[in-house]
Amino acid sequence: MILEMTDGYEGTQAAIAELYVLDNNGERVPREGWTVDYVSSEDNEGVNRTGDKIFDLQESTYWQSKPGAGYPHIVVIDLGRPVNASAIQYLPRMEPGAPGAIKNVKVYMK
């Protein structure tokens, strides 16, 4: 799965606390076996905001693009098996006023 974030609500940073893929029945696809194949930018200097935080089952952790890196931001996730997806659910950072709210995203499935 490829996520291409093309715009945000404020600034150039993007952040995802949790991401879920829904199957054709609207059920969440198990995330065991998911791996990050590529991120165009991640904030890992002195903090741990790497791509794998998107599906680590902890809403308090998150992936965030590196400060100053402009859009688009791309994350490639290997779902570990074929998935017939009908939708995704995205949980943003939960802190009040936190940067990184994503406005537009394109999702590509193979």
Indicate where each model-derived feature is located.
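Disordered, acidic Ser/Thr/Pro-rich linker "stalks" and the adjacent N-terminal cap
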Residues: 9-85, 93-100
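Short, surface-exposed beta-strand/strand-loop-strand elements in extracellular ectodomains
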Residues: 98-110
